[in-house]
Every structure is written in C-alpha cells, then in structure tokens.
Amino acid sequence: MAGSARSAMAAKALQTILNIGLLVLATILVIFLVKETFHLAKVLLISNEKDSSYQLIEGIVIYFLYFEFIALIVKYFQSGYHFPLRYFIYIGITAIIRLIIVDHKSPSDTLMYSAAILLLVVTLYLANSNRLKRE
C-alpha cells in the first residue's frame, strides 16, 4: 500500500511539473504568435514588392505552426492529459510545407518532401479510421 501511494504521489508531482512546463511553453508560443502577427502586418504593409510575397507566405506558415502547437497544448488539457496523434501529424505536414516554400531549389528534395507529406496524409487517414480512433 505504501508503495502504491508513493507511486501515485510521484505521478501527480510529475504531472504537475509537466502541466506547469506546458503552460510556460504555451505562454512563450503566444508571445511568438503575437510577434509573428506584427511581422506579417509589417511585411504586408511596408515591405517592397520583390521579397514580400515569399516572406508573407513563409510568415503565414510559421504563424500556423505556432497556432497548431498552441492548439495541441489546449487539446492536451481538454482531453485529460493526452496528446492526440493527429495534431502531431498536422504539425509535421505544416512544417514540411514550410520547408518546401523556403527551400525549393532542388527538385529531388522537393519530391522527397512531397512524398513525406503523402506518407503523413496516409498516416492521418489511418489514425482517423474507425479501427484506430480513440476520441
């Protein structure tokens, strides 16, 4: 009995530390999200025409990455301290899309990135199928 009570107390303490860490991370991500909003506004309203379209698209994708990480943390607290797999897949797809937009010099690399996106989409389909669905 004493061992199981100690284990439960240790698990609760570690869960509290994890929750505090995630709240700190969420706060940092919100700050970066606000900074990215100002950056997007600056690129949209002030930048020159030549570079602004690439910077705008890259900024939008980075914005969505921050947004997805914040949504993942929110979902973690809403779902009883559980990270849904599909949110990690969404983040992976968005990160690879950003990589394609930023670094598209090599056609073979772009093809490999596209294949990785296809693999992640198939994984997302399988994760959302009735056989594997938990939610």
From Swiss-Prot:
Task: Look up and give the membrane topology term.
Answer: Multi-pass membrane protein
Alphabetized, the UniProt keywords read: Cell inner membrane, Cell membrane, Membrane, Transmembrane, Transmembrane helix
Where are the membrane-spanning stretches? Answer: 14-34, 54-74, 82-102, 107-127
Annotated localization: Cell inner membrane
Q: Name one GO cellular component term.
A: plasma membrane
Instruction: Provide the primary localization.
Output: membrane
**GO biological process: what's one of them?**
cellular response to phosphate starvation
What PANTHER family does this protein map onto?
Answer: PROTEIN PSIE (PTHR37819:SF1)
Classification via NCBIfam families: PRK02833.1-2, PRK02833.1-3
Task: Spell out the family assignment given in the record's similarity comment.
Answer: Belongs to the PsiE family.
- State the name under which the record lists this protein: Protein PsiE homolog
Q: Which source organism?
A: Pectobacterium carotovorum subsp. carotovorum (strain PC1)
Which lineage ranks, top first, belong to the organism behind this chain? Answer: Bacteria, Pseudomonadati, Pseudomonadota, Gammaproteobacteria, Enterobacterales
